[in-house]
A protein has these predicted regions:
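Pseudouridine synthase
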Residues: 38, 44-52, 83, 119, ...
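Short acidic, glycine-rich loop/turn motifs
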Residues: 167, 213-220
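RNA pseudouridine synthases
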Residues: 1-127, 131, 137-146, 154, ...
Length: 240
């Protein structure tokens, strides 16, 4: 499939270059801002995938995203710079050799403070939207799904947790936390609070903080991105 280069402005190019947090001959990692789609979508605005044309070489080859983040999720996202790297990383992802660690804000601390959630999910289409729902193990179409969480800080106004998906289902962390009665702040789709004791939630409060992956040249590489200002501000305002 030949893709036409996206029509990027100099501001677009400067923006995507400013998000680079790691680059070598094989991979390039970005700290994705919230509100930017990874790929596709019905919104006419540029996606991160479009913006990768800023890194196109003279032969027309350009980096390819290895995985995705939801539009309102901020943080680390990885692209492969060569076809062999894309193939290697795609296989590693399928074999669950990526370790993804997220930070999330909740209205209250989970109980227990740390646990693994093992709850199968099934995709459901409602209108033009896709949702994931927790279902029984023997439900047709059920996909095994496990997530780990641990509470990093908690107070009367909320909690900050580290979340780690052990499988790679759509919306997995969001649905699993809602399933235990602790939906993420700002997660409209899965019942999260839109307001907090200190004001409105700016978005889904989920940030991909750290990604550890096998590098095409050997060994493992870890890339980290600090939470953006909206996340850090709300966390501080909640006394966390």
């Amino acid at each position: 499939v030949t893709r036409v280069p996206a029509d990027l402005s100099s501001d677009d190019i400067a923006a995507v270059r400013s998000w680079v947090i790691h680059e070598d001959a094989h991979v390039i990692a970005f700290s994705k801002p919230p509100g930017l789609s990874s790929q596709g979508g019905r919104i006419k605005a540029h996606t991160l995938d479009d913006l990768l044309w800023a890194f196109a070489r003279s032969n027309g080859k350009r980096p390819e995203l290895v995985h995705r983040l939801d539009r309102d999720t901020s943080g680390v996202i990885l692209a492969a710079k060569t076809k062999p790297a894309a193939s290697f990383l795609g296989k590693a992802l399928q074999m669950r050799r990526f370790r993804k660690q997220y930070l999330a804000l909740l209205s209250a601390a989970p109980d227990p403070k740390a646990a693994t959630i093992d709850a199968p999910l099934r995709r459901e289409e409602i209108g033009r939207e896709s949702y994931m729902r927790v279902v029984a193990f023997d439900t047709p179409g059920a996909q095994g799904s496990q997530s780990r969480y641990r509470t990093l800080a908690a107070g009367p106004e909320g909690a900050v947790v580290e979340l780690e998906p052990l499988t790679g289902r759509m919306h997995q962390l969001r649905v699993h936390m809602a399933h235990i009665g602790r939906p993420l702040i700002g997660d409209v789709r899965y019942g999260g609070a839109l307001t907090t004791p200190v004001g409105p939630a700016p978005r889904l409060m989920l940030h991909a903080a750290k990604l550890t992956f096998p590098h095409p040249e050997g060994g493992t590489t870890t890339v980290e991105a600090p939470p953006p200002e909206d996340f850090a501000k709300l966390k501080t305002a909640l006394g966390l």
